[in-house]
Structures are given as structure tokens and as C-alpha cells.
């Protein structure tokens, strides 16, 4: 006999999510398997990532799964979507979302414009390979990497400031999941800077190329600032819209839209 699960479908600039309130999970579920099932485009609901959230005192805990069932440490677009959903349900405009050990301070400016204080980023973490190793990788696969830098936004990102064709982005994104280079995989950002705008495409670990990536925007913005390619504020441009990024006292602030697509019932067999 199948069970029923209430869900919400949302997206941030085309980066889409199935979102479930934990209190609606009345049975016992393997969440990794549930994520894989619901994320299927033709046999499920379809999404880039699967989100479970739960209210805890004055904040909301968010747990993120990729379409392959693996867990993710952060998602900027999902954070804006969850903030909007909570605002629509409760009227709250200032919302704290907790993901792992990171607290994200969200403010709903209006229904279509949400800002998120992502906090600081790091350019020196144990997971980051040496620059020489990255260049060895590039030479092995004959990839022209003009400028690369690793950045930790709460999840790992490699930012490549080099224009690559879509088919090459897929190849590079997949090849960079080499365990010898990045033990837990890495999100790969392909960034092109023009007129203080970053035109961005992101290969997300566990999901592949997506239409937008909020944490990728944060990481690429921070990397661009560090390398002197851009200044704050800056627009990060994706296929279906933009995010406005700025730096305040060492914190990265992301501002942009979130869209409610549907609410429904999923029949879990």
C-alpha cells in the first residue's frame, strides 16, 4: 500500500527543488532513496535537489539531498526558496535557516526578492588541492584553465575563470570529481567576467549541470573579489535571471528571486 507525502515544488532561477516539511513524513523513510525517487524527471516529481526542513525554536533546519541520494552541505537557491515558503506560511520576514554548522540569515524584501547573508568564505581548507595538482589535471586532459581558485562557502567550489563550451563544461565537471584531486567531489564553476558582471555556469557535484547555483554565485563572487576581477556590488548572471551579490564586513550577501511552482501529494509505493 502506498503512502502519501505532501510536497512543494519551487525554483530559484530554474534551479528547482522538491521541498518537504519533516512533520509531513509520518512514516519511516530512507530519505536518500526517497530523494532519488522524487527527483526523477519522468518517474517522480523532478528536481535538482531534495529538501527536508523542520522548525526548531527560532530557526529552521534544512537538510539537502542531491539527485543521486548523496547529501549536500549548502544550497543558496534552496535557502531563498525555503525563506519564501516560510514567509508565505507564517508572514515572517526575517528567517534563520540552519544547514549543517552554518546559519544563514534571510530577509524577505518582498515575495519575489529575498536576501541571504551567507557569512564568510574560506580560501584555505584541508580539502583544497595545491595549484600544481590542478594544473597537472588540466594538462592531462588538455584543458585550457586561464585562472582557477578554490573557495569554501560551506560547501566546496572550484572557480574557473575561463570560457568553455557546454560540452566541455560537462566533461571537465565530471573529470574534476577525481577522488585523488577532490576526495569528496567538488562543485565546478565556469565564470566569465564582463563589465563587472559574472556570467556563470555550475556543474554541481551529485547533480551535474544546473540552470543556476546560489552557493556557486557566492563562491564565484568571492573569488572574483579576491583576484581583483570585479568589485562589490556585482551581478551574477544565469540563463534565467540574475543574483545581486555584495560584500559587507566580510560577509557575502546574496539577493534574488524564488518561485513557487506547485503544491501536491506524492504517492510513495
UniProtKB/Swiss-Prot annotation:
Pathway: Amino-acid biosynthesis; L-lysine biosynthesis via DAP pathway; DL-2,6-diaminopimelate from LL-2,6-diaminopimelate: step 1/1
Entries under Gene3D superfamilies matching the protein: Diaminopimelate Epimerase, Chain A, domain 1
Alphabetized GO MF terms: diaminopimelate epimerase activity
Subcellular location(s) of the protein: Cytoplasm
Top-level EC class: isomerase
Major localization class: cytoplasm
Entry EC no(s): 5.1.1.7
Active site: 75, 213
GO cellular component: cytosol
Catalytic activity from the UniProt record: (2S,6S)-2,6-diaminopimelate = meso-2,6-diaminopimelate
A Pfam family that the UniProt record links to this protein: DAP_epimerase
An individual GO BP term: lysine biosynthetic process via diaminopimelate
Function statement: Catalyzes the stereoinversion of LL-2,6-diaminopimelate (L,L-DAP) to meso-diaminopimelate (meso-DAP), a precursor of L-lysine and an essential component of the bacterial peptidoglycan.
Assembly mode: Homodimer.
Protein name: Diaminopimelate epimerase
Upper taxonomic lineage: Bacteria, Pseudomonadati, Pseudomonadota, Alphaproteobacteria, Rickettsiales
Amino acid at each position: 500500500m502506498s503512502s502519501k507525502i505532501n510536497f512543494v515544488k519551487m525554483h530559484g532561477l530554474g534551479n528547482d527543488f522538491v521541498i518537504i516539511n519533516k512533520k509531513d513524513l509520518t512514516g519511516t523513510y530512507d530519505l536518500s532513496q526517497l530523494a532519488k525517487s522524487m527527483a526523477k524527471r519522468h518517474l517522480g516529481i523532478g528536481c535538482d535537489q531534495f529538501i527536508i526542513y523542520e522548525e526548531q525554536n527560532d530557526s529552521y533546519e534544512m537538510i539537502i539531498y542531491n539527485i543521486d541520494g548523496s547529501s549536500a552541505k549548502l544550497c543558496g537557491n534552496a535557502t531563498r526558496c525555503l525563506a519564501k515558503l516560510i514567509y508565505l506560511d507564517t508572514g515572517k520576514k526575517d528567517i534563520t535557516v540552519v544547514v549543517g554548522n552554518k546559519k544563514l540569515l534571510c530577509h524577505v524584501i518582498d515575495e519575489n526578492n529575498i536576501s541571504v547573508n551567507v557569512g564568510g568564505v574560506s580560501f584555505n581548507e584541508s580539502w583544497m588541492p595545491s595549484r600544481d595538482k590542478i594544473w597537472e589535471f588540466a594538462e592531462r586532459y588538455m584543458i585550457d584553465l586561464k585562472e582557477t581558485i578554490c573557495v569554501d562557502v560551506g560547501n566546496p567550489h572550484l572557480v574557473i575563470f575561463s570560457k568553455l563550451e557546454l560540452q566541455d563544461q560537462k566533461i571537465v565537471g565530471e573529470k574534476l570529481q577525481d577522488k585523488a584531486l577532490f576526495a569528496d567531489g567538488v562543485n565546478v564553476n565556469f565564470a566569465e567576467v564582463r563589465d563587472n558582471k559574472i556570467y556563470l555556469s555550475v556543474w554541481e557535484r551529485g547533480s551535474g549541470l544546473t540552470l543556476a547555483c546560489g552557493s556557486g554565485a557566492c563562491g564565484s563572487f568571492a573569488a572574483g573579489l579576491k583576484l581583483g576581477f570585479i568589485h562589490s556590488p556585482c551581478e551574477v548572471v544565469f540563463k534565467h535571471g540574475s543574483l545581486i551579490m555584495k560584500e559587507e564586513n566580510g560577509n557575502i550577501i546574496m539577493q534574488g528571486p524564488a518561485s513557487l511552482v506547485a503544491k501536491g501529494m506524492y504517492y510513495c509505493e
